[in-house]
């Protein structure tokens, strides 16, 4: 009889092993066997919990997305109600420590690539994209006319993704300060009174 709570402990252990495997070997080098080896368990147990490699990647991305959404909630809770502060909080969440470790960044890159081919991952990516846009649009709408708010939200979402992508591909530590400064300067520019 399995121990109470063992399922969640085992799943977390396997997700961590997946993140490490993608970090060290890339998605193509990550197999159920390589994850099992890193977790020091049998391949059969990995199959039992996730079915196949796609199921494992989906569960890993759901974990990373939950971390992102939790970071967004944390940063927004700490911000004032002013749109500028709330927008900066959403930006900060996207560059939160939970999102910029090498294993997580490499997993995001693998996820983006696979989401073009795998419907389940595409749906997850769509949910994430819509959530970011919705959060940004809601805050911009407090300070800008509707059409400008939508345009500003699209622009800031693209900037966040672009800064994150460049940082992930830079090959060194992620420069959070520089990314935050660029994104926050863009927010200031968008919210500046027009002449």
Curated annotation (Swiss-Prot):
Keywords: DNA-binding, Repressor, Transcription, Transcription regulation. This is HTH-type transcriptional regulator BetI. The gene is betI. It comes from Burkholderia thailandensis (strain ATCC 700388 / DSM 13276 / CCUG 48851 / CIP 106301 / E264). One of its GO terms (molecular function) is transcription cis-regulatory region binding. The keyword Transcription regulation applies. Repressor involved in the biosynthesis of the osmoprotectant glycine betaine. It represses transcription of the choline transporter BetT and the genes of BetAB involved in the synthesis of glycine betaine. Pathway: Amine and polyamine biosynthesis; betaine biosynthesis via choline pathway [regulation]. Residues 8-68 form the HTH tetR-type domain. Disulfide bonds: none annotated. HAMAP family: HTH_type_BetI. Residues 31-50 bind DNA. NCBIfam families: betaine_BetI, PRK00767.1. GO terms for biological process: glycine betaine biosynthetic process from choline; negative regulation of DNA-templated transcription. The lineage of its organism: Bacteria, Pseudomonadati, Pseudomonadota, Betaproteobacteria, Burkholderiales.
